[in-house]
From Swiss-Prot:
This is NAD(P)H-quinone oxidoreductase subunit N. Belongs to the complex I NdhN subunit family. One of its GO terms (molecular function) is quinone binding. InterPro entries: NAD(P)H-quinone_OxRdtase_su_N. The keyword Protein biosynthesis does not apply. NDH-1 can be composed of about 15 different subunits; different subcomplexes with different compositions have been identified which probably have different functions.
Amino acid sequence: MPLLLTGQAFRRDLEANGCLAVQAPLEGGAETRLLRRLRGAGYSTRMTSARGLGDPEVFLTQKHGIRPPHLGHQSVGRGAAVGEVQEVAPQLGDLFESDAPVALWLLEGQVLSRSELLSLCDLCKREPRLRIIVEMGGARSLKWEPMTTYLKA
């Protein structure tokens, strides 16, 4: 198990490709172990779910609007025709304040469409400090490949 002990091959592939598709064991543990190794190498890390992400690029890097649940209440002339809109800070905004590289681990990445996965790859190319790891399902052992290679298959 030297792969899980050092994580150097994973980090080397992540830095070379920017966006990786990962298949991790379903019992868990591999993702937190690798994130701990990345933090030890100087990365700022964040783990989040891909469910409910919406437009990934806007959600992760730009200030954007959301509509809170109405909970059955009627708005009386306070909001727009579509309802109240609240502005939300980007998910990765605080991680980009330092000069450290940023690693984002997205759980349940199999719910994302092909175009959303390609936009994540493009985002890694435009923002050189950002590295994205997308968990694309389970496997008996930890496997990863570049996202572009995964999408071609």
